[in-house]
């Protein structure tokens, strides 16, 4: 019989602490099923973006601009870009609590994320967001929006 290595034994409590600190959502992770831009905010205006829209319509966005993306399901490779340049985004988990979707606060089932990306828009350009599902069918979803 092979003796256990001290290093491998030391990993067990570390893994237990790591797993114990992870949130328990109580359900299988839903596959990524939708990504879309739902809001663009700048000093000139805030506009709600309808489904399947290809461009902003209400105003010409310039300067500091926030782009909000809704992601239904869970992915593991979120990527936001404006005119090809990678962006950093803030994400907020969204949970289903009964029939209501809300920011997670320890109750409900994790159903996706809201990402907010900060841009500095100098001229019209394309915002792109993509992510790949963490489980079957491991599909990659993408949304594009022309920001005028």
Model feature map: region roles:
Residues 10-20:
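Bacterial N-terminal signal peptides
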Residues 71-99:
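Extended low-complexity, serine/threonine- and proline-enriched intrinsically disordered segments
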Residues 116-147:
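Short, exposed beta-strand-loop hairpins at the edges of beta-sheets
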Residues 24-62:
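Short, compositionally biased P/S/T/A/G/V-rich stretches that sit at domain boundaries
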Residues 1-11:
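Bacterial N-terminal signal peptides that target proteins for export
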Residues 100-117:
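Aromatic sugar-binding surface patches on proteins
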Residues 57, 61-75:
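Aromatic/hydrophobic beta-strand junction motif of beta-rich domains
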Residues 60-62, 108-110, 120-124:
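Surface-exposed coil/turn segments at beta-strand junctions on protein surfaces, enriched
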